[in-house]
Swiss-Prot record:
Main location: membrane
Membrane topology, Cytoplasmic segments: 1-47, 95-106, 159-163, 218-581, 630-667, 741-743, 794-1123
Transmembrane segments: 48-68, 74-94, 107-127, 138-158, 164-184, 197-217, 582-602, 609-629, 668-688, 720-740, 744-764, 773-793
Positions in the Extracellular compartment: 69-73, 128-137, 185-196, 603-608, 689-719, 765-772
GO biological process terms held by the UniProt record: adenylate cyclase-activating G protein-coupled receptor signaling pathway; cyclic nucleotide biosynthetic process; intracellular signal transduction
Deletion consequences: RNAi-mediated knockdown in sugar gustatory neurons does not affect sucrose response.
Main EC class the enzyme belongs to: lyase
Subcellular location: Membrane
Alphabetized UniProt keyword annotations: ATP-binding, Lyase, Magnesium, Membrane, Metal-binding, Nucleotide-binding, Transmembrane, Transmembrane helix
EC number: 4.6.1.1
This protein's encoding gene: ACXE
Name of the featured protein: Adenylyl cyclase X E
Length: 1123
């Protein structure tokens, strides 16, 4: 994390992620070393294949030049044969590394073959020179010294860098030893010439620089490869997580909605998230849609638990949830067997539809058989638990509307006249029997069932009489004998969820199996990772990025290794260069070496000969200081979290460093300056030569046989080696466009070739050659061209790895965004299924099929029903708008005491206040075990704090009643809007009946196939009765609720003794509301704990806040006014 250090920050976290030590430790931490080792073996095999092609090309060109340019070919047949033979031996020895099984068992062979190949080429090169020294008195220079060192560091399969360094130093030492023995002719002359002008120290510095360049390439290559590997690992993890998350999201949606409804909803949620992030809040972008479909020819089953009220008031919360979970779980499993889709259950009511998702000609039979099966199940549950319960079931066939309305706590539901008829058949039915209509009977196999006429209560029901519906009673299925029934019940019991709470969590073996599958998929993806920039498919325009599939052309790399998508290419070039410090330290090291060589090799005495090299060396040291100062500060202070105050100079250095890393133009300018200044340093050496004077001195030497002065002109092989280092340096800078580096290297090569063949052809021609009678200028040119070719090939490999790595990072960011979007949508969906306080519980506990229940001492429950609302398609559109407005009000009841929407039943809106885990008297033991000890203790402390004052919990009644009044205001405003629309003014009269009751409530999640959160208890039953017995335009409350409201200063008028089913006659009250829809006040003895709760939010203020927040409420008002 960034640490505040005085006036600036030392943020080294991103730079540290590109350090070799960090990447290696990260691989070890993720236990990826074995996979990385296998991937690196594949990489080295691709490097070897590249080296084979390169070495064959170099050997062929070298031998062809020898045979084409030398007239006395007999003398060079030995050289040609030795070169070809050595190439064959190298390829033969190194080819064994392509045998995967052998290398897997004998990894030591990779290093051993590298040593053998290197020393073979060294001895062949030295043998050729020594042979001609003794056989033909030719003093020859070596040809493969630079080439072998490059080969060791860049192409040979040496996994550990220390091994490559030791081998390269050995090769360098052998060549220096050859120079001492055969060129300097003994250690005495070597010592005397070591620090002489143009002496041996120049060659030693040259070899040291070659090794530095090789080490740099190894470090940079290992860093890039490890970074790519880790990025790929993260990408695969994100892809697997996203795949699982999408599967989870689909399962969640399918558990509440059929696919034809869930898919548009899923896309709509994700689209809204994206638009919100983009700041799009237009009317068209956020219009409400109504996800409702028409389904003809279906059968509707309504089932009601007889004596349910007694059940909820006598059982403990744990026992109640367990019984309901067992019962409804059995129903869900039976419905699944008979292809009937459960819609929802409402306390004691369970209803479902056959033929909804897929047309089913046998829908009536399936519904009736399911009804009889449900009766059998409840009989078994009654016997198991010793309960006095039974089942009353009604079935009707016809048409219906199905879908989702509202915008909070989304639930799939059904509407229509035939749905109402099915409900009436259930309420007028006989316990233990299936009550069906004539429409259902017409679709039944009548010979299968025992059918009787319907009860008298049904014949006298006004709705059934109005539509002339005749009903029938079915008591049993004649085709299902007791043995088959018992067998089916046993099967259901074996998979029933009644004991889900006792089931163990996922076993360790299952976890290990999942981990094994994950690692196997990782290994398979790693095996697909590309390893080479040279691919026939790439030449055809097909590029693969380890996906196993061809990617679109706009993401491909062309033959120049640039993205064909210019936007992607620009993004790649604008990356921060975290490898800059390594490039600049290498440049400084090589630059200082070039300055040293220039000072040792030049004979001119002039101010520019010293000022320019000194200036170049100074600037390079300053750039190196800027590049490494941040690393130094982090090593000294940041790593150990040592507090330190940085002065202005340090902050200035930090800012310059960050500016360089983040600016491509600045880095290119620095790069070009270093290349040009280094080339000028070499030019000083070359320009110190007086060509005419050298030619005359050389002629006089040949005529008069005296030794020429050593420093009359530059040493050609010294300058050639300098340019070779410069070409290496040209390609060392990371995150400089490869086209720029290639262009600079080509210009350097061409400029030097002009010097060789034109400007100083005489000097180069009379320098030491590498083969007898082989023109020296050809030897110089060949070495420069080989160096350029090696560096260009290696740079393409590094650039390819960088481009693939970048493409993966881009894909990773896309996957992370997609994963974040999916995760966000999952949370939204969960919060629209379950109350927010148990979403985490569902993810942690219910996903493992564990029971969950809660017990609350004080909860206020509200039922609100729209009066005289016809359930046709036009009315459903209006109902959707009204319910959405009610849902919007919930946004203003999220503080302290939260109002939770429970469900919608037809035109009835059910909500509760006080369902907060902090107020829960008890929860399931599984929940407590799932909470960490610290969090659990804090949670218990909060509960005790709230439980110490029972009066504080009574405030939920005031909040719930305030929300109910806001609903009445919202409906009044909506009704005004509908009155201005000709087609909608007669849909509803805008009246609502509301009932509220408060007290102890039990809550939990039940069901086998769908997570359903519900509440039970006397307040739930009483609130429903208050609504059904209430008056339109009033809030009907119980005596206990009215007493609490009066304490908060709200008048409640006594209505009288009201008959309530299951309770008889009880006193009830109407909340005092004036004509302006405000509470009628009275003297208050208590006040809301949060003052903002004392001011009830009106619809007008709701719209004002909603417009400011671009909420959905303002959209609804706009939609209503524009209809």
């Amino acid at each position: 994390m960034p640490r505040s250090l005085g006036n600036c920050q030392l943020n080294y976290s991103k730079e540290r992620m590109w350090e070799p030590g960090y990447l290696k430790a990260k691989c070890a931490e993720l236990r990826l070393e074995s996979e990385f080792r296998l991937y690196r073996i594949r990489l080295w095999k691709s490097y070897l294949l590249t080296f084979f092609m390169l070495h064959i090309f170099v050997t062929s060109v070298h031998c062809a030049l020898l045979l084409a340019t030398i007239e006395r070919r007999s003398i060079i047949y030995f050289d040609v044969a030795l070169s070809i033979g050595c190439a064959l031996v190298l390829i033969l020895v190194l080819s064994v590394n392509f045998c995967d099984e052998f290398i897997a068992k004998h990894t030591w062979y990779m290093y051993a073959s590298s040593i053998f190949a290197s020393l073979t080429l060294v001895f062949a090169d030295l043998t050729e020179s020594i042979y001609h020294t003794y056989a033909h008195s030719w003093i020859l220079g070596t040809f493969y010294d630079t080439y072998i060192i490059y080969m060791i560091y860049m192409f040979l399969p040496i996994h550990f860098i220390s091994g490559a360094v030791l081998l390269a130093l050995l090769v360098s030492g052998l060549y220096i030893l050859y120079f001492v023995i055969f060129i300097a002719q003994g250690f005495a002359q070597f010592a005397s010439a070591l620090f002489s002008v143009g002496g041996m120290s120049v060659d030693i510095v040259h070899y040291l620089c070659l090794n530095l360049v090789g080490i740099f390439y190894r470090v940079m290559n290992d860093t890039v490869v490890r970074s790519s590997f880790l990025d790929r690992h993260q990408y695969i993890k994100e892809k697997i997580w996203l795949r699982n998350a999408r599967l989870q999201e689909k399962q969640l949606l399918d558990s509440i909605l059929p696919p034809q409804i869930s898919l548009p909803l899923q896309k709509d949620i994700q689209g809204r998230i994206v638009m919100a992030k983009q700041g799009i809040h237009s009317w068209t972008a956020m219009e409400r849609t109504m996800a409702i479909q028409i389904h003809p020819d279906v059968s509707i089953l309504y089932a009601d638990v007889v004596n349910y009220t007694h059940l909820t008031t006598t059982l403990t919360v744990e026992m109640l949830v367990k019984v309901l979970h067992d019962l409804y779980g059995r129903f869900d499993l039976a419905a699944y067997r008979y292809k009937v889709q459960r819609i929802k259950f409402l306390g004691d009511c369970y209803y479902c539809v056959a033929g909804l998702s897929d047309p089913d000609p046998d829908h009536a039979n399936n519904c009736v058989i399911l009804g009889l099966s449900m009766i059998n199940h409840i009989m078994e549950v009654r016997d198991i638990h010793g309960l006095d319960i039974n089942m009353r079931i009604g079935v009707h066939s016809g048409n219906l509307f199905a879908g989702v309305i509202g915008e909070a706590k989304l639930q799939f539901d059904i509407w229509g006249l035939d749905v109402t008829i099915a409900n009436v058949l259930e309420s007028t039915g006989v316990p233990g029997c299936v009550h069906i209509s004539g429409a259902t009977l017409n679709n039944l196999d009548v010979n299968r069932f025992d059918i009787e006429d319907g009860p008298e209560e049904a014949r006298d029901h006004p709705l059934l009489k109005k539509y002339r519906i005749r009903s029938y009673i079915i008591r049993q299925d004649l085709h299902m004998d007791d043995e088959d029934s018992d067998e089916f019940l046993g099967d259901l019991h074996s998979i029933s969820l009644c004991n889900m709470g006792a089931q163990p969590r996922i076993s360790d073996s299952a976890n290990q199996s999942l981990r094994a599958l994950f690692h196997e998929e990782l290994r398979e993806e790693f095996r697909k990772m590309p390893v080479s920039a040279f691919s026939p498919k790439r030449l055809l325009g097909i590029c693969r990025f380890n996906t196993g599939k061809e990617v679109p052309a706009h993401q491909n790399l062309n033959i120049c290794l640039t993205f064909t998508d210019p936007i992607l290419e620009r993004a790649y070039l604008k990356q921060t260069d975290y490898m800059y410090k390594y490039s600049i330290i290498l440049s400084a090291s090589v630059g200082c070496s070039l300055v040293y060589i220039e000072l040792m090799d030049t004979q001119m005495i002039c101010s520019s000969c010293f000022v320019l090299p000194a200036s170049v060396a100074t600037i390079q040291c300053i750039l190196a200081l800027i590049a490494w100062y941040k690393k130094y500060c982090w090593t000294r202070y940041g790593r150990n979290n040592v507090p330190h105050h940085y002065n202005g100079f340090s902050c200035f250095i930090f800012r310059i460093h960050d500016k360089i890393l983040n600016s491509l133009p600045i880095r290119i300018c620095i790069y070009l300056f270093l290349m040009i200044s280094s080339f000028f340093v070499m030019c000083l050496i070359v320009m110190s030569c007086q060509r005419e004077e050298f030619e005359m001195a050389y002629i006089e030497e040949r005529l008069f046989h005296y030794e020429q002065e050593a420093h009359i002109c530059f040493h050609p092989w010294v300058t050639t080696n300098m340019l070779s280092l410069m070409i290496c340096l040209t390609f060392t800078f990371a995150h400089i466009p490869i086209m720029v580096k290639t262009a600079v290297a080509i210009l350097e090569t061409l400029a030097y070739l002009l010097l060789i063949f034109f400007q100083f052809d005489f000097v180069f021609h009379h320098s030491v050659t590498t083969n007898p009678y082989f023109k020296s200028e050809y030897a110089h040119a060949l070495l420069i061209c080989i160096t350029f070719l090696i560096m260009f090939v290696k740079e393409r490999q590094i650039e390819f790895t960088n481009k693939v790595n970048f493409n993966w990072r881009v894909d990773l960011r896309k996957e992370e965004n997609a994963a974040s979007l999916t995760n966000h949508s999952i949370i939204i969906i969960l919060n629209n299924i379950l109350p927010s306080h148990i979403v985490d519980v569902y993810l942690n506990s219910l996903a493992k099929h564990e029971l969950y229940f809660e017990n609350y001492r004080m909860v206020s429950v509200m039922f609100a029903m729209l009066i005289n609302f016809e359930m046709d398609l036009r009315s459903l559109r209006v109902l959707n708008e009204i319910i959405a407005e009610f849902d919007t009000l919930l946004l203003f009841y999220k503080e302290y005491y939260t109002v939770e929407k429970i469900k919608i039943v037809g035109c009835t809106y059910m909500a509760a206040c006080g369902l907060d885990l902090n107020f829960a008297g008890s929860t399931s033991t599984n929940r407590k075990e799932s909470i960490p000890p610290t969090e659990f203790n804090e949670e218990q402390s909060r509960r005790i704090l709230f439980q110490q004052s029972n009066e504080d919990l009574d405030e939920v009644v005031f909040v719930m009643t305030s929300y109910a009044l806001d609903m009445m205001r919202t409906l009044a405003k909506s009704n005004e809007a509908y009155q201005s629309i000709a087609g909608d003014r007669n849909i509803t009269d805008g009246t609502i009946a509301i009932g509220i009751s408060s007290g102890e409530v039990m809550a939990g999640i039940v069901g086998a196939s769908q997570p359903h959160y519900d509440i039970w208890g006397n307040p739930v039953n009483m609130a429903s009765r208050m609504e059904s017995t209430g008056l339109p335009g009033h809030i009907h409350v119980t005596e206990e609720t009215s007493e609490i409201l009066q304490q908060f200063g709200i008048t409640c008028s006594y209505r009288g003794m009201t008959f309530v089913k299951g309770r008889g006659k009880i006193p009830t009250y109407l909340v005092g509301i004036d004509e302006n829809l405000n509470f009628i006040p009275q003297k208050a003895t208590r006040f809301p704990s949060h003052q903002e709760r004392s001011t009830v939010i009106s619809l007008q203020s709701t719209y004002t806040h909603a417009e400011n927040n671009n909420s959905i409420a303002s959209t609804s008002r706009h939609t209503l006014q524009s209809l």
